[in-house]
Amino acid sequence: MDGARRSRLLGVWSLAVYLFLYAPLAVLAAFSFNRERLTAQWRGFTLDWYARLLGNTQVLTALRNSLLVAAVATVLATAIGTAAALAFHRHRFRRQGVLDALLTLPIVIPEIVMAASLLLLFAGIGLRLGFLTVVLAHVAFSVSYVVLVVRARLAGFDRSLEEAAMDLGAGPWRTFLQVTLPGIAPGVMAAALLVFALSIDDYVVTSFVAGVGSTTLPLQIYSMVRSGVSPEINAASTVLLVATALLLFAAWRVEQGGRARSAAAPAVLGLAILAAPFVLVGPPAPEDRVLNVFIWSGYLPPETVRDFEARHGVRVNVDLYDSLEALLAKLQAGNASYDVVCPSNYAVEILLHQNLLQPLDRSALPHLSNVDPAWLDRDFDPGNRHTVPYFTGTCGIGYRRSRVGEVDSWRALWDPRWKGRILMLDDARETLGAALRLLGRSVNTSDEPTVRRAMRLLVQQKPLVRAYDSANFEDALLAGDVWLAQGWNGEFARVMDLDPDLAYVVPKEGSTTYLDSLAIPAGAPHPKLAHAFLDFVMEAEVSAAICRSMRYTTPNRAALAFLPPAIRKNPAIFPPREVVGRLELLRDIGPATTLYDRLWTEVKTAR
């Protein structure tokens, strides 16, 4: 093979690699300008999603938090890392190799390990989760990068310049400020920009250590994905992507030194664009007039928040979680400061067992009488002493009628005719639960042989499954990527409004139901305001407005009078009585949770 041909082949391979890396990002950015909510169809150019993004207070607050955290963490990490780099480069001391390895360890250890260890540390010393813990965590994982970058710059630094300055009478500090620091400035600047980029992008560590009012933009975006990947999320991701790219480009150019430093201007411009919406976020309210809510994304309409703020003259901080495990971890750590949380029924059992919820004052909840008695006095919270019902729902099958006809059984998800067109939830309890109901067993069984039979059913089904996805199953069905999808009724109800060919069914073998409740954590800083919020969302008109917006089933009987017939008579939102009779609440199964998780892992890794 001649040189020209090898060169062309190398160019083709390089192009393929870059397309693989960057084509998805280009698609994301392009569809942030799509007029259609469905990302699989292009309906024309629009800037509406960016306008909506600028009007989203939660996103703007998260953006502000990201910028503040990144700025403070950058200053601290750069100062500490530069000092450490100088010390390790210029001095020799005992066990330096061990200390050097420990200093760079955060680069190689898994992020999840660092996140969990930091959460335990903060809980152990009684430090409340919030802005400070996020900053400290970001400094902890980024100092190592500063040390590596600055030491690389120090390797080429001529120390004779320092000696000459000191021979001329300059003291140590003057020598450092006027000789050393200017000489290593490109490395320091590059390290600072790298830290800023790492901080503003971080999700894993931040998700563990963030507390009240410290939700960052990555946390906000990831939580919003639970309601589907809308162009608004694409717009926010594009803004973050562009800013990060500018910062990394500037870091590389600054490290080159000389005239290349002028290339830092795009980074400054990117930061200015990001910071512009900051002024749109109002100043924080006094501490005693703040309500801190920790809830699922897509569960609390912004209009409801604004109405409560206007009525009570308070500010509501809404932080979002993407799994019940995240909620449990924050409350179990004991150093969060939330006033209202939204656990599912089996999470309530765990929280009550650990005394993490405070009793409710029923006299402050007159609108509890609006709730359907069928959803009150459940065995996970007898007498509703600690919780009030908020949303309920079912797990079933969403399907495309024109492709698969009418569906009434879980067996449709095992039908080889639909190979590659089936989607299952990435959820151990729900997915094993579907197999258990197909076997005629309870979704709450802890009998290992029975659960193993369900696991084997899922392994047999796996060649038919296109994906396991709990975040975007309804979008995959709407786009036509799959024709059958296991999922929850609220998400399917929203996309059924967009495509009449879509339908939802609770299989005849039965399925799971859940009851998400509102509760006040033990030690909540504003319990009176929390009671006012719980009572507010139980008002008939407020509950109806939430149901209209979110499309989940409201257990508020009085709200039905304020719902349009299209919602009130939609069986996907309000299942008929015969369907309710074959639903089973998910319960806390205690030690058997480990069994479910282990067997679900076997399903996911099966070939």
Regions found by a protein language model. Give the residues of each.
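Extracytoplasmic ligand-binding site segments that recognize negatively charged/polar headgroups
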Residues: S337, C342-D481
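C-terminal transmembrane helix and the adjacent membrane-cytosol boundary/short C-terminal tail
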Residues: A4-V12, R92-R95, R151-E162, M166, ...
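Transmembrane-helix boundary motif in ABC transporter permease subunits
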Residues: M1-R6, A71-L103, L120, L248-G257
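Membrane-interfacial helix termini and adjacent extracytoplasmic/periplasmic loops
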Residues: L38-A40, L47, R95-Q96, I112-F141, ...
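Glycine/proline-centered hinge or cleavage motifs at structural transition points of membrane proteins
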Residues: L168-G169, P182, F391, C395
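Transmembrane alpha-helices
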Residues: V12-L25, L105, A115, A140, ...
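Early extracytoplasmic/lumenal segment of secretory-pathway proteins
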Residues: P283-L351
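Interhelical loop and adjacent transmembrane-helix boundary motif
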Residues: G3-R6, R37, Y50-Q58, S199-E255
